[in-house]
Amino acid sequence: MSAVSAEAVTPGAVRSGSDSRPRSGGDGAAPLAPRAKLLPALAAVYRAQLSRARVARIPLLFVATFQSVGIMIMMRGVVDGGDEARAVVAGSSVLVVAFVALNLLAQYFGQLRASGGLDHYATLPVPPAAVVLGAAAAYASFTVPGTAVTAVVGSALFGLPMAHLWVLAAVVPLSGAALAGLGAALGLLAPRQELATLCGQLGMSAALLLGVLPAAHMPAPIAYARDLLPSTYGVEALARSFDARPDWAVVAADLGVCAAVGVVSLAVATWAYRRAAVR
């Protein structure tokens, strides 16, 4: 039995095999990469989503636009002009946004959650808000050409003035933010992928029925339900722009409601993403 002097056993002289790797600091933990800032991370997610959906973009735009143009052609035999024509054209144009931003984004996040794809995003050093906002912005941007084509075709079909169609530059992003946030929240909160798809389809159907049909002909309970739908205020803002002298204060108020709903819905979607990613 050999004796070892106390001086020979110094702190750190005895190391286990599992602790023999080089240490980068005093606590032995390797430093992690710093979390990316919100705006650069958002831009990266946005570009990645655009690249991922590039192949499906043309068919997607065709389906969404063809659907809205077909609805306007069908309604042309029923509606002659006036407020009803404005409602049909504005509702059909915003329907393109609802088809993509609400319906398809709900399906995308529902599929991502069901397949475990959220685990991939959870490993990236990006803020949860960047994932949600980047995907929402990418899906909403898909709708710009289709919405513009639908508005121009509808204006020509019903003889509406096109002088103020520039308001689409505000209607599309604001209503897109509100509907995309709602779609992302539905997809992330739905317990099953099938329910996420169903919620997206029901939301798009509500945007169709409550947006295209003139509000004056709706029963009171349906009119109240219409007021709760975020796309309604984008439809109202666009419909008012077809007037000879639009009331821009009311248009701005409608767009302000879209913006407020967009902030709330995207915040809920970000919370839902955090909740789903840690499960």
Give the location of each predicted region.
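Hydrophobic/aromatic residues in alpha-helical transmembrane segments
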Residues: 70-75, 98-105, 149, 181-182, ...
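Hydrophobic alpha-helical transmembrane segments of multi-pass membrane transport proteins
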Residues: 85-157
